[in-house]
Every structure is written in structure tokens, then in C-alpha cells.
Amino acid sequence: MAHGEPYYSSKPDKDFNFGSTMARRQMTPTMVAKLPNFVRNSPQAYDWIVRGLIFPTTGKTYFQRVVVITGGLEDGTYGSFVFDGREWVEIYPIEHLNLMSSLKLIHKANALQERLRLSQEEKATLALDVQFLQHENVRLKELIPKPEPRKIQMKWIIVGAVLTFLSLIPGGYAQSQINNTIFTDMIAACKYSTETLTENLDLRIKLALANITISDKLDAVRQILNFAFVPRAHWLRTVFYYIHYYEMWNIFMFVLAIGTVMRSARPGTDLITLATSHLSGFRMAVLPTIPFHTTMTLWVMNTLMVCYYFDNLLAITLAILAPILGIIFLCFMEDSNYVSQIRGLIATAVLIAGGHACLTLTGTTTSLFVVILTCRFIRMATVFIGTRFEIRDANGKVVATVPTRIKNVAFDFFQKLKQSGVRVGVNEFVVIKPGALCVIDTPEGKGTGFFSGNDIVTAAHAVGNNTFVNVCYEGLMYEAKVRYMPEKDIAFITCPGDLHPTARLKLSKNPDYSCVTVMAYVNEDLVVSTAAAMVHGNTLSYAVRTQDGMSGAPVCDKYGRVLAVHQTNTGYTGGAVIIDPTDFHPVKAPSRVELLKEEIERLKAQLNSAAENPATAVTQQPVVTLEQKSVSDSDVVDLVRTAMEREMKVLRDEINGILAPFLQKKKGKTKHGRGRVRRNLRKGVKLLTEEEYRELLEKGLDRETFLDLIDRIIGERSGYPDYDDEDYYDEDDDGWGVVGDDVEFDYTEVINFDQAKPTPAPRTVKPKTCPEPEAETQPLDLSQKKEKQLEHEQQVVKSTKPQKNEPQPYSQTYGKAPIWESYDFDWDEDDAKFILPAPHRLTKADEIVLGSKIVKLRTIIETAIKTQNYSALPEAVFELDKAAYEAGLEGFLQRVKSKNKAPKNYKGPQKTKGPKTITH
């Protein structure tokens, strides 16, 4: 194959074609057969290198070329091999960047294909398991016996009918049947009239004697309500007419018997209890005691009530002896059953004895019924918190629990109705992200972690002292490095580069700890629990049943944002440590340079204090212990204000002392010196030294404020170059120069605190024949301003040559005030378009001071261009320039004139002999 077709090991190798084609042509069958184990379907780079560069060679063989192949091996390494005539020998790897990038992509693709294959196999296995489970589910459903419709036995229907018949008997008093005749009707009418007259007479006597009782008042109110709210012909009167023959117990037992037959799980026991309570006469007093009974004590109560029907004294004796006998003969039971049985026997004794007393004294058991209800209510109010009694042994282990919630042995269908009742509340949804969870596996055990940002967050005790941990995510295992562990029980693990979670959790910006959600992996199953939490400093506590492996789980709010990291495991309660954004990064310790700077500042402060109080500094002795003094906030504020006032005063004095040479009077606005080059402009001169500049910055003056102050000073003391033209002078055009006349400003001046002072180029000054002495600078008296102006005008008229004016004080305005005559002309579309510059060409001062007026003028300009009516434009521009003049800014009409028209007597740029600038 020498000098034949190029050799390619695979299609990707041919597509990439890395290296030398000549080297590929040198491949022989022997070389191909002995090739190293490169990655299948991967490219290689072929090089044809001089032999002497690889092997120690002398003579003519030095310049012979050999084939070198570089590629990725199956063991994951990268290497280069050269053929020495017999076999391939590994040499130092040659770096081919494109080849290395391609191998990385191929390796990643192979890894993804392997994951896909494993996932597909797992999916097929799970699908098969699901099918098996579905078949098993169907088979088990067929084995479950179908519930048959409930059938009520005929004997219970007969017993219920008998009880219903007994309850419908009005009473035990028989009434004789009387034949109604005209005489009997007259007797009944007379009897009714006599009773009514008697009631009226009694009422009048009571009113006369003022002997009205509370019962009389209640009867009167009842009659008023009866006649006021119930009409004379109403169905309620008919119902009450028939009901008043029956007692309340009869009606209640009728309803209870029907409910027992229809809904009770044990109708026989319930109906027998109703029958015995009716026969014994205890009636309503029996019902409140039923929750205290067990099955055995319930039958004891029924037996004693039947015995009471025949012999009340025997029943009372047995009822009193029942608790004593139960304590003795039931001691073989376990504690929980023993307590329940004794409690039922005591309730039976109270019922029999108290019921007999009430029947003997009052003839009814209503008072006993009220007493038992009151006791139950008090007991219920005192045990609202606890839900069970725990019985413990000597070691403190709970061996049994007795629920405080009373369960009925009889008539339990009410509780079933309550359980199947209508819900009264709606629970809120919570957001969970299972894709953000992973399992942290260490030699000590397993824990839960979650992805947040570029880290995996878990509990520090789940990581232990390990530097590297295994992260299990979606069935795959990754090795990750522990990045940082703060003082809290939290660990931050760097997320591996090839691990890409489907979801990440974010920290809560506004934490709400009222309701928290804990989600974790336990035995490869996702568990989620929601509970109310309490904050204890930097920790949370909540009632959640926790298990091993939940350490490091996220504790989130209802929106799925992280609040804390789950920590403790007590079985019934959970705890977590609150996580903050500051916990993600370690607090950097100050460097040695920063510590030295702080020490220097402290020493400077001590030196300044010693300089201010030299006597104290000399006589002060070192004190071993310092007295602690309590200082209020107001004292601290006063001290800070005093210190700031002193520092600002010192700062003002220093600035005034430094800038005093530059705060000089300005020259008057004349045209006498236009042809003369101004001197002493101090171009490129440093206004302050670097030490003074830093000192001002340390005093509290920031850089931006300081630069603004320097710009203002420059604007007050410098301006455009002024030339002296002896041949030109116009008294009427005294206000010609607008830009640069009232403010002397040199745009070429450079403020530089680091560069050296440039050397100004020499200038040729036009000699003067009759120089006049300059007058000394005097402060301007505002009261004599008009007189000086008149004198100045007279001197200008008399002189044959323009003279210099006296320096004028600094003015906050720019140029001359706008005059209406300058704006009163015929405006056209071009004038309207170019009167305002583009928005990006406006200065910051224009936007701040004239922003609203500029927007208004733009609106007027747009309207004028659309309607071709420019009558309102002059007044608007005049108002804008007037506002600009008052703010110390240049008018916009003046800017247009300055831009379109060069200044008079402009002689072009000045010629200097400075260094040339070479541009590349």
C-alpha cells in the first residue's frame, strides 16, 4: 500500500482527515494489522516526521521519515505511536487540538449512548414489572369478596317496632270516653270560661299587688311570641296539639330506634339498651354514660336496669358492689383493658344510684342527665390537648396507650356519619421538584442532597470528613468534590460537569415559615411531608416523622423555594438549619496588605489626636484596664456631627488656600485684545500635586465632585485665545463675541495628576507701540455699576484705540441675554429642523435643566412642520433660550449661528513646535 491510496480506519477518520495525507499513503498491511487499540469509529492524526526527531540516529537515516499516529485509546487515554519497522512504539503524545476536541465529543457521545442503552433496558424491565403488577392486581381483585347488600334481620325489625309502640304510648293514665251532648258542650264551655276568668283575676290581683314572678313574665313572653310569630291557622299548631300528649323521651326514643335499625352495626345491643332504659325509667340519663362503657360493662348496665325494674334496692346494691368486685376479679387484665373496665363499672354505679335518687325526689332523671353532661363537658375542656394516655413501664418504655377520644360501643353510627360528613376546609397545593433531589453516598451512610445553583447542598454530618462523595442521580453514580462547609451543619458539593439535573431549587427571598414541605429519598422512594414550623434562632422545628437517609433534604415553602436543610431525626419531630445566601461562599479573611493599611490608619488617628492635644499625649500614662462607659445613640450622633463639621471646615480652608491663586478677577468684555495672544494660560499645568489630591480624597471629597469643582475653577479663570486686531473695532458690535467673551476657557488645557508637565511651544507676540499700564484689580461695587459703565463708554468714545476694560466678576449667565428682535423673522422648515440638536448630542446639563422645555419645543416643531404654520415657533425658541440664559447655558439659536458661521478674525489653528504625533 506504499504510495497508494490513503488509509482511513473508519468513516469518521476519513471525514475529519487529520494530519498528513502522505503519511496515510505509507501505511502497509503489516502496519495496519499491528495498529494500537484506538477507539472504534474515531479519527486519528497521521504525521510524517523525520526519524532523527524521534529516535537517536546518525548518518543518512537521520532524515528518513517515519509514520506517527495520534489518537484516543479504548482505555480513555490519549497517545502517539511511531512504527519502528517491526511494531508500534508509544512516544510522547503530540497535541492536535482539533483531534482532542473531536475525541472529547466522541467520548461524550459514547457515554450518552451507553446511558441510553441502560435506560432503555431499565425501561423495558420496568414496563415488564408494570405488566406483571397489573395482572397481579386484577387477580387479587377477583379474590376480594364483593360486599353484599346489608340485610336487616326480621327479629330486629320486630324489636324496633315494639320499642316504637312503647314510645308512642302517651302515658299511663286512662281516660274514660264521654258521650258528647248539648249539655256536655255547655259544661265544657262554662269550664273553659271559668278557667279563663280565674287566670285573668289572678293576673289582675298580681298586678295590683305587684306580685309578678319570673315564671309569669316567661309565660307572658311565650304567649306574645306564640301569637306574634305563629298564626292561628298554621301547621305548627296542629303538630304541637298532638305532640303535647307525648314526652320528649318518647319522641327521642322513636327517632333513635329507627336510626339504630337502619345504620347501627350492632342493632341488637343498641335496641336492648333502649328497651332497658325505657323500662327502668332512667331514659335520657343512660345516653351520656354509654361512651364510658366497654362491651362487658354495657351488658352489666343492661342487666342491672332490668333488675331495677323488678327490685330497685337489689339493683342499687349490686351497682355499688360492681366496681369493688371488678377491681378484685379483673386484676388479671392488662393495664389498658383494666382501666377501661373499671371506668365502665363506676359509670354504671353512678347511673343506678343517681337515677334512683332523682326518681325518688323529683320523679324524673333530667337533673342527672344535666349533671352527667356538665361533667363530660368539663372533662372534655380539660383534655383538649392530649389525644391519648401513655402507660409506661419502669424503664420508661410505652407499653400501651389509652385514647382519650371516647369511642361508643353502642350507637356508634353517629360517629360514622360524622366521619362521612362534608369537609369544611381546603388544603393548599405545594410545589415540589423531585428532579432537584439526589442521594449522597459515603462510606458512613447515605443522605439526601439538592441542586441549587452550581452546587449540591446537603447536611455536613452526611458528608463527614470525606473530601469526595458519590452522588446518585437518576440511577447513575457521579463522583463530586466537597467545596465548602460553613460553621452550620451544611455542606456544599461542586456539581460534576457531566451531571445535568432537570431542575434546581432557589432560595426564598421572603421566607414564610408557617408551612414547610420536606421532600427526600428514603429507600429509593420519594417521600413528601407538610407541616407547620417554628423558628428558633437559626433553626426550624416541625412535627414530621423522619427516617434515616433524610439528612440534607430541602425544607421548602409552598412555592418550592428553599428555607432550610433538614438535619435531626428523632422519629416523630424534625429539625432543620436555616440557609442564607451568605452561607454559599466562605468569608474571605483580610489580606496582609489590608491589615497593614488598617494599622497605618489607626496609627495616623492616634498621631492626629496626639498632635491636637500635646499636653495630654505627654502626661498620659498607659492604663491596664479601661472603664466601660455606656453611650447613647444621641451622644454618638452628636459626636459624629461635631467631627464632620470640624473636618468640613478644615477641608474648605485647605481647598480655598490651594485654589486661591486661581480665583482672580476676569477681564472685561472688549475687543481690544483680539489680535494678541493671551499669556499665562498655564496650559498642561497641574492644579494640584498628587499628594494634595489624595489628601483631599481622604478628607471625604469623592473624585466626581472634585473634578466638577476643578472644571468650574477652570471655567472661571480661562477661556478661548484672544487676539488683538488693531485695524478692526466696531463700537456698535460691542456684544459680537458671545462664545468665550464672558468666560475665559482654554479647551486645550489638560488636567493630569500622573503625567509630566508639557513644555509649551514658543509664540510670537505682536509688539505694541503704546502699551498702557493695566489698572489694579479692584473689587466690583454693585451699587456703582451703572456709573462705571457710563465712564467706560465715554473712555471708549474718546480713545482713538481700543482700551482694556476692567475685570468683571464671575457671572452665572452665558453670553448676552436673548433679544426678541433676533428671533422675530420668517421661520421656515429648515430653521425648525436645525434649531434643536439630536437627542444624543444634548449635554447632561441641557437634559437636567431644560428637559421639559426641550420636549415641549420638539412637539411644537413637529406640529409646525406638519401644518406648515411656524407662527408659534419664534416665541417658543425665545422662551427656551431665555431659560437657558438664566441657567447659565448657551442659547440654541446662538449655537446654530456659532456652528454655521466661523468667528470673525479667525486665523486658524496656531502653529507650535511641539512634538509630532505619529499614528500607525
Curated annotation (Swiss-Prot):
TM region(s), chain numbering: 239-259, 286-306, 313-333, 344-364
Source species: Human astrovirus-4
Stated name of the protein: Non-structural polyprotein 1A
GO CC, alphabetical: host cell membrane; membrane
Active site residues according to the UniProt entry: H461, D489, S551
Top-level taxon: Viruses
Post-translational modification: Cleaved by the viral and host proteases. The protease is probably autocatalytically cleaved.
EC class name: hydrolase
